[in-house]
Amino acid sequence: MLYSPLYQSIRLILFGALGLSSLTVSAAINQTDSMMPEPLVTDSSNQYADDESIQESLKRLAEFYERTPDTNVATSNNTGTNVSDEQSNIQNSLTPVTTNIPTVGSNLRLLPHTVDSAARCEGQWVYPKKNPNYQRAVNEAGASNGQPAPNLNGLPNNQAPLFAESDYGYYDNVDYAELSGNVIIDQGTQHIEAEKIVLDLSNGVAAAQGKVMFTDQATGNASATQTQDRVQKNGKTSLTDKAAQGGLIGVADNLNYNTETGQSTATNVAFASVELQAHGYAKRLNRPNESQYELDEVMYSTCPPTNRKWQFDAKSIDLDTETGRGEAYNTTFRIADVPVFYLPYFNFPIDSRRGSGFLLPNASISSENGLEVDVPYYFNLAPNYDATLSTHIYTTRNPMLSGEFRYLTENYGEGIFNGSYLPNDKEYDGEDRRSLFYDHYWSSTSIPRLSGEAKYSHVSDADYLNDFDTLGLSDNTLNLARRAQLNYYNDYVDGELKVETFQTLDALNNNGQMLQDKDKPYSRLPQLNLDYRLPWAKNFDITGVSDSAYFKKSIDDGSENEKSGTRFYNKLSASYPMENSWGYIKPKLSLQHLFTSYDKDSLVDNSLDKDDGNQSVFVPQASIDAGLHFYQAGSPFGAFDDTLGGYRLLSPRLKYTYSPFKDQNNIPNFNTRIASINYEQLFSDSWFLGHDRLQDLHAFTPGINYRYIDATGVTRFDGSIAEQFYIDDGGVTLDNTKPVFTSSSSGLVWDTSTQPYNNVWVDVSGALTNSYDLNYITTELRYQPSDNSLFNVGFIKRQRDENTNQLPLSALTASAVFPINNNWRVLAQGQYDYNRNQMLDSLIGIDYEDCCFGFAVYGRRYYNDLNIADKPTQAIMAEVRLSGLGSGSSRLTRLLADKVLGFEPVQSAWKD
């Protein structure tokens, strides 16, 4: 929320007014010389201070901005217990004493660990020194009463002892007290300084006058539970958590408070948030009652006070804690003191409650869309539903209107609509562009484990997802799902019932031709899937699979005859697993049944009678899966370096499978395909993905896995190799084509993962054909020299496979995220197809980050995944981020998270 730090500062200012009432209960005064009271100034309508006065307040506030880049903001200038000590004490109380395992292995040092250790900011806001007299007075008070001194760490401020000191003091033992000359008041983590503090309960007036300074450290506002949560999250807290915990410093000329009405007024207030590293001022602050606040001439920025690159200025701000809303009037956003945009009125939240109003605008620049400005408006329609309406303004397109509607019901679930409309797009031959996405989720309140979901997706054209950063979908998708689904599970059954259709976008098939109706997926109208197990036999595992559906695909372009109908598939299996620490053996028997029936339209189109349109087939299957485990302690590199320790595990495996041949050439294929080859697939019961074919498979598969795990539990090497050998040729085909499995073996398959250094990972997988030519190989090398840098290099080469519709590809992939110094970094990623001599996707950019703001400029050139023959899209994008405002997620970070392996932890380290 934009002005929540302002609201937090007001709360702290009022501590100075509200906390003064406790002076009537306890006060420790250095000198008790009696003195006559001076007239008390209570008029809150004095002439506003001039600009020099507010500048004086800012100068006083700047005393707490320390120019030491290595300073810990939570502990600077503190002589008492700090945040780290508090977290350590809590962590020690929560965690049992353990023996630390030293780190083993080493890091690869090809690049410097850090390029530039200079801080991003020239300084930071720090708390003032703790008053040493406070703890001393607390200790002495406890000793005089024969009681131990209270532990102030974690003690709520309203329960902590109050201590006051000054040069002069007066108290009439009834209802009047006055302190003057270097007045200091401490209670817990709250601290006030002033030239004079007066309390007159008879007139209901309290006042702090002359160079008022107040602070409330965040550690004092965090409860024990909050602090414990912070420790368990490695000390990281969200922006909202930080704002709620306080951690503020404020200075003012004076503060007046009416103890009867609750009205208070302060002038020339300057404040800083240590937790948020933000600061600002208000020329005048007035609190007419306990729930309303009025500020005049307000400024807020997260930049250093010595170099304020941006700031928000408002003529006035009104806050209401009852409604949870604030109103800003005549607000101007400035960059380098130059006005950038102006809002005459702005309504915003000051707590977690929702309310209607404008949200923070977004802006970006690209060569395709030009300048894009998004202005969202939020509608708080009811506690259980709301809406957001956004206007997108482009310099190269007509404006787009998009909306989001969210709802939550007590018994019928929750959902969200997203839609957009752009009329007469100048960049798309004047066509209208539109989209609609809907998602609904439901869980039964009366039947446990019963849930449901619904999904709808629609776009106007195949390029829509490519042109716009769409809510609901981030990548190009050929088939957009539309479905309604029910799910249920318990200890014995896991089932789903769904109806599903698709919107298929215009695209090219594998032959470079436009997709035809025959290439589109079947609709399921409906489909019922059940996975179940029967608890009849104690030592046997009896399981079953049932898949029943009506498949429909309309053929309107004459690309083939329509083949729609019903399919019923059932499989019942019984196994007797025998397992031990040294190995296992799992024999299994299965019986499969497949029944299909064409519908009336398909019978006519294919000139079939009803009997020919019905097909039924039974196929039994038997298999034995066995493996051994050989364990040996120590490192395989012990002859060279035995410091890694750990153990090695060698696991050979052998599986035998037999299922006979049954002719299935007259059975339609609704949604079945042949699986791609990989290590795990070699040990499955079938090569068909789907239930339109029951494979005849007579084969045995030997394989072996070797793993090395070091002393800290890190898997340094995990490698597997296997090959499937066929005793009989396979005769079942998908679509009356030649048999697929007629060779002697599948070819050799391997899969390895290695971590030779603590910051280097290497993955290699591949397969050979049965003649031991290359089928495919993929490699991925990841090097992370530091927490905020990353380098990836990958290679993939695969041959054409007509059985799986695998296209040939020879491509290199590379990505890099590395800092130039502590403020600048380079971002790059690319995918190059050297068979086509074509860069399929490339991005390069620079990113800047400091304590005040950040920006990125990057260029991207890429092809539409749905039509690689089209010309590539080229875009130059720019984005600006303001520290402390917005979610921190941008189009660039979302794109890189999808394209760059391991980007998200690197991004978190860079932001921290």
From Swiss-Prot:
InterPro entries with a match to the protein in the record: LipoPS_assembly_LptD (IPR020889), LptD (IPR050218), LptD_C (IPR007543)
Keyword annotations of the record: Cell outer membrane, Membrane, Signal
Subcellular localization(s) per the UniProt record: Cell outer membrane
GO cellular component, one term: transporter complex
Pfam family, one: LptD
Main location class: membrane
Family: Belongs to the LptD family.
Assembly notes: Component of the lipopolysaccharide transport and assembly complex. Interacts with LptE and LptA.
Protein name: LPS-assembly protein LptD
Species for this entry: Psychrobacter arcticus (strain DSM 17307 / VKM B-2377 / 273-4)
GN (gene name): lptD
